[in-house]
Each structure stands twice: as structure tokens, then as C-alpha cells.
């Protein structure tokens, strides 16, 4: 075999020997949007910014990711475990604890298998970004100079 025929045989053999999807295996097997693992030497706050950017790419919000990050900085210092002094507000975007069960139900999907806790950074962020995408930042209207 010469030339193009030989090249075709090599390409076909290579594709049959490499399992489908092996080169593009995800870093995580968690379902749903923005299932990002922390990378080496990444702080929690850096990871939260990545999750916010990821969610905003999927559900655009007024002011984009920069505004969302600004609001999260003011609300919690980008700390997923932040709880207000009286315990009324929780997580990255400081959702009202009393409103959290309804917000979780309304703004997540069961197939995503998100953690139900408001103190989960990914879940808290996805709920906030979806709310802001649909309704604007009204729930966070009084937040700083963002």
C-alpha cells in the first residue's frame, strides 16, 4: 500500500484502538452545571469566582460575571460557608435562610443532583445566578457599589 491508502489504514486503525471519549474525559462525574473541582493551589475564593463565571456563561445576568462577583464579595467575601451574625442569611450570595427551600426548589433541577444546603458554594451560586438571569438583581439591589 502506498500514499493515501496507507494513511487511511493508519487513521482507521488508530481510531479503533482508542476508546471513544478517552481523550475528553471530564474532571468530575457529577451531573449538572458548573461541577468544577478546585485545582491545585486554588483558594476557595478563586474557585467561587470560577463557579460564578461558569454559571453566568450559562445564564447571562445584568452586568455579567463582574457584577455577580462584586455582589458575592460584598455579601460573603466569596465565602461559601458565610452566615450572617443572626443566622438569617447564608452562603456566597447570602440567601435568606427562610426563603432558601423555595429558592432551591424553584431554581434548581432534580437531575442536577445539587446539594440542598445553602452553604454549598455551587448550589448557592447557581440559584442566585438563575434568579438574577430571570429577574435581575432586585434581591440584591442594596448591595454596595456593584
Explain the meaning of each model-derived region.
Residues 1-27:
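Secretory targeting and sorting signals
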Amino acid at each position: 500500500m502506498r500514499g493515501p491508502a496507507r494513511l487511511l489504514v493508519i487513521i482507521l486503525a488508530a481510531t479503533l484502538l482508542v476508546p471513544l471519549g478517552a481523550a475528553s474525559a471530564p474532571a468530575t462525574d457529577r451531573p449538572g452545571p458548573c461541577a468544577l473541582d478546585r485545582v491545585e493551589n486554588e483558594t476557595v475564593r478563586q474557585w467561587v469566582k470560577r463557579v460564578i463565571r461558569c454559571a453566568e456563561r450559562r445564564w447571562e445576568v445584568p452586568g455579567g460575571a463582574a457584577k455577580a462577583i462584586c455582589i458575592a464579595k460584598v455579601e460573603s467575601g466569596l465565602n461559601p460557608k458565610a452566615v450572617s451574625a443572626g443566622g438569617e442569611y447564608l452562603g456566597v450570595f447570602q440567601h435568606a435562610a427562610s426563603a432558601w427551600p423555595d429558592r432551591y426548589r424553584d431554581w434548581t433541577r432534580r437531575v442536577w443532583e445539587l446539594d440542598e444546603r445553602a452553604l454549598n458554594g455551587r448550589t448557592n451560586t447557581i440559584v442566585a445566578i438563575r434568579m438574577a438571569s430571570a429577574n435581575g438583581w432586585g434581591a440584591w439591589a442594596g448591595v454596595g457599589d456593584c
